[in-house]
Structures are given as structure tokens and as C-alpha cells.
Amino acid sequence: MLLKRETLRKIYYLLNSVGAITVLLLVIKALGFIKVRIIAQLFGTSRELDIFWAAFTIPDTIFNVLVAGAINAAIIPVFTKFLHTDADKLRDIFKRLTIVYSLFFIIVSILLFIFANQIGSWLIGADNLHKYLGTSNVADAQNIEMFAGIMRVMIISPILLGISSLMGAYLQAHKRFFTATLAPLLYNLGMILGSLILVKYFNLGIYGIAWAVVIASLFHLVVQIPEFRHLYKGSGDALHVKFMRLFSNLFSKDILGVFKLALPRIIGLLGEQVNVIVNTVISF
């Protein structure tokens, strides 16, 4: 009888959790639609908005290919495996992955910041491609400068989302799905509020949307920190790391194993994102 009650309690808890997450997912979809509608209402079918979406393609591609592709395909399964076999190794892998991704994104962000104008010339000012295709290209030097400025604002976004996604994977490995699901909801909410406030009240124009992306990415990260810290401290490990020890063997066998698992998914997503970039080039 006691066993039956315990089973029923677990089923009840599971159904409640599934129900709450389902509602969250519906709200996320609704907010995503509202976000796009608000941005469209603020700028209509303007050239500025086209340039924003083109600039957004670059950080979005970096995040989707290198982080989003690896999370479900490799990182969560590896975290879950070591959670049940070697909790110390799980924490070690988390630290190393965080350092690897952070360093990579910082280096890429610096390069994107330096070569933003050249990327803009290639992406929205591809005159040779348009001549080959027989299409017109109306992107001028001012458009390319705007593209570069918008992209420079948004390049911090993949760093924030990368760390946030690793935290989300850590939470999901511990079966804490609610907070991990709450993060994209806060992202959409940050985009909506940031766009309205920065564009309408601070008169930042299209750059207000770019800063809204950064604010939304920060929301995505911050909402997960309290529960992540609680789980991490509860494991008996401190959040600080001995960086020299980690750097001495940063790409350990386990870290390389994560990227090996993620590689097929990364290649698949890369193909999809190349298609998006090509469509962006042609559309200009």
C-alpha cells in the first residue's frame, strides 16, 4: 500500500511538472510571436530592419552551430552519465567546457568586432555575386557601416547564451527542467521589453533592438544562476576553479569525447545555417 502511494505521488509530481513545462512552452511560443510583431511594428519593412536581421545572422549562426547543436546531442547525455557515475568528473567537465566555450567565443567576438565591416561588405554588399545572379544590390557604404555597428553590439550575445546553455544542460542533467525552460521565456520577454523601452523611450533606433538582444541574453543567463548555484554548492564543490590546473589539460579525453559526439549534429546545423546565410546574401 505504501509502495502504491509512493508510485502515485511520483506520477502526480511528473504530471504536474509536464503540465507546467507545457504551459511554459506555449507561453514561449506566444511571446516569440509577440516579439516579432512588436519589432515589425516598430520598423515595418524598413531597410534598417533588414540590416538588423542580416547582422543577427552571424552571432545566431555561431550560437546555433557550436552550442545549441552540442547541447542535446552530446553535453546533456555526458552530464547525465557522469552524474550517476562520477559527480566530481561531471563538475570538472562542466568547468572545462565553460572555459573552452568562453575562450572560443571571446576570440571569435574580437575577430568579428575587428572585421565587422568586411563581413558586412561580403554579406550585404556582395556586388560580384549579384552581378553573377543578375540581381540588383542596393546596399551602400552607410548600410554596411550600420550592419557593422549592429553586429558589434550583438557579438556579446553568444558568450552569454553559451554559458547560460551549459548551465541549462547541467540543470537538465539534474532533472531541473522548469528553470531551464524558463530561460527562453525570459529571453523573449527581454527582447520585447528591451525593444519597446530602448527604441520608444531612449530613441536608440535599430540599435535599440541590438541592445535588446544583449539584455535578453543576460536574462537567459541570470534566471538560471540561483538554482545552478544551489545544485553546485550542494555537490560540495566551490564555484571557483584552479585555472592553471584546468588549463594544463584543457582538452581532456572527456572534453574531446563531447565534441566527437556533437560533431555530426554540428555539421548538420552548419549546413542549415549556410543556407540561411546564402538566402541573406541573395536577399540584398
Model-derived segments and their meaning:
Residues 2-284:
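Membrane-embedded alpha-helical bundles of multi-pass transporters/translocases
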